[in-house]
């Protein structure tokens, strides 16, 4: 049972070396080197050691007392029960004894064993333990050795000896050394005191002590409630179960109730808490890097209607002027304090009415009716050139997708409000309700230059019209130094391009006077606006009087932001505006000298990666998003040679953009969307405007077809307009377009469904708007017209005014128009485009609009953009 190997420190008596021989002396606890050497020698063989050395004190002198006898007696009167478990359970009450009469110099070992009292099995019934049968087979006896053993008699006598560490188990296969007992049997603990040297000796006596009050019955659960109460009250470790303890029944129930309540509250909190959505609008004055803007545009989830799910739509948009304060994230790194969003009245119709319900793919459908505060002199709204040319396209994800009806497309009743509004309050991107990606493709590469006005513009649209206000308009360019030599044109302040939905009239200059009734706009100042990928013919045919000043917006959206475009009548000379595109990475502040004297206002359009510094004094730069056409660029009646340098799509020009001046025949006229209202009065003195576009277009004069733009009412239909454009661009930069298709009319026969402005039924049919526009040679792929035009939601139910011809046949089905103008080879794979459109914008965003989010810095040609699933996209 006890071996020396278990306790190497035990000083044993004479050890038996063989049957009859013992070592003559005890083995020292720590033998010395000499002893070890002597031990190597053969030991002296002696007869068995005679047991003559009896203990110094008589055997009966050793006494043991049960220290906690009172507690044991208290339990024994009721009937002590001890819990046994598979894992082992300590005893309570504990065995606490006190020894006396030991030899202080001798070492002793204390052992505990538990033996059955009888051979019966018990059951607790009728509040007493009764014998119910014979005992189970006796288990091998196990002994618990006190941890202090071996210890001298002095050690044991000077302290209370407790066997509290002994554990009882009913696991017959226990390997932990616990005492194995049967449940429902009666047992008696015993304590043995043995001299350490006598452990292995025969015939030596040991002292065993038993206490009748320590008998107990083993149970797996307390049977007698009195025992339970005694144990709870007596056991310091069970005080939690007492009446005033933490584990009492009352406390347990209370804790359980609190736990259930807290869990329910947590569930409610989880349900009620607002979701952490990255789509939430960024606070104003947030400096968005171009990459962040791109990510935001691409990653934001789009709801079915293409709006932020988080965005709360203004519930009651009524005729009454409602102040709409948009907390739109500004794309500007620096926002002057004056750029706080101003209240602006919105037209009665809701954005939801104008916007397509399920066309979430039309990223830039919505314009904001946000009033733009007057730009400060040194207001530098540095519009980061988002690396993704289409970061602006996801404008619909902006919080309140309100078509900027107030200024750009102001319903007749709303016009008066704007008549008095300073030019700075022109919502940019007003009419760009649903810009095809093609129109908005440039917006990202050429961040629309928005002064403070950009605050309310859709981020993705980034259509920031530079609308000078009554304030000194010297620095209109977001990046221009605080004191650039810009002369403000005060007279233009009241004027703003407004599409009177009621009248369906857009002032020819695209600029309606504050009353929008100005019969004749004298010399419209050539306003510079970033040119969208589609470059329409620069000059309207001088012969077309009514259309002479039609805004050269092939864009379906009339830019309202064109305030100050009409120089005061006193300005006999229209200021020619040259739009040089600065090389990428260069932000060139453009000092636009707009004065009575014609000043060429150079609008450098930086390639992608550049911050556009459009400083338009009077004229407000039009968001590039309206790339499909030069929006509201008053095309002087006089022929103007405009050199269009188209940026090569494949490469971003790090150096200055090579602009191969393409001389435009003076006769070239910009086709205006049929929906555009005819200009009330001809502009007497159009100023020649040169539009240098980055050149992917091969050098060489491109004879822009001298298109005589009839008044909007006279514009019969897009087919007519397209036919009128004989312009053939040599070697179009589009890889997917065969050279024979370079003819502009062929390529741009795309019919875009008219986007109905939220305020009025006026529809700007993009098909008429864009057909004349040459396919953008810029590296900004336009959204395939097929993806836009085929949305039935885009077709507004509002009828065209009599002066505008609606072509229902073109709107519902693009094939006939496409086949007539464009080679069928382009569209053969997809006879029905509407079928390919997914109603769920999320699922369809990846492929159809993938090109919108592509980075413009790609080194490869445009082919990758346009070859989307076998579908050619312009």
UniProtKB/Swiss-Prot annotation:
GO molecular function: DNA-binding transcription factor activity, RNA polymerase II-specific; RNA polymerase II cis-regulatory region sequence-specific DNA binding
Entry keywords, A to Z: Developmental protein, DNA-binding, Nucleus, Transcription, Transcription regulation
PROSITE patterns: TBOX_1, TBOX_3
Keyword rRNA processing appears in the UniProt entry: no
Annotated segments matching region Disordered: 364-396, 428-453, 466-551, 563-626, 664-695, 720-776
DNA-binding region: 71-243
Gene ablation phenotype (knockout): Morpholino knockdown of the protein results in a complete inhibition of the segmentation of the presomitic mesoderm.
Compositional bias annotation for Polar residues: 367-380, 429-442, 468-480, 495-528, 536-551, 584-614, 664-674, 720-734, 742-771
Subcellular location: Nucleus
Predominant location category: nucleus
Bias type Low complexity, positions: 381-396, 443-453, 615-626
GO cellular component, one term: chromatin
Extent of Pro residues compositional bias: 683-695
Task of the protein: T-box transcription factor involved in the development of paraxial mesoderm.
Full protein name: T-box transcription factor TBX6
Originating organism: Danio rerio
Gene: tbx6
